[in-house]
Amino acid sequence: MKIPLASIFLCLACTAASAVFAAEKVGFISVDGAIGPATASYISRSIEEAKAQNMQCLVIQLNTPGGLLDSTQKIVQSFLGSPVPVVVYVAPTGATATSAGCFITLAASVAAMAPATTIGAAHPVSIGGFPSGGEE
């Protein structure tokens, strides 16, 4: 009688443990480089995949010198509209989240940084210069 009772207990314990682990799925992606349309699309698809798989959150490891404003805005909008919490982790050691990366990090549900990483320099940069006011 002790063996069947122990077997039932073991089965229940395994079932409960698998339910706990199934509820704690976490997505992970890495973004390393300039922010552009491909990055915005990649992040948007990853958020949709995390939602479809009922993940607890999506972790984005970020290392970027910045990028395009339009792509940054799309990423921020996808974070703000996401039913899945987004965690931005600036890493590895020595990584940066400057310019567009700063805005992306600050828009996340949770922002975290590895030791010796940097964030900042968040201002628009003109690539083509300003048109002249006339001939001189």
Where are these regions (language model features)?
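Positively charged n-region of N-terminal signal peptides that target proteins for export
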Residues: 1-7
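Soluble extramembrane regions of membrane proteins in the secretory/endomembrane system
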Residues: 20-136
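Bacterial N-terminal signal peptides
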Residues: 7-17
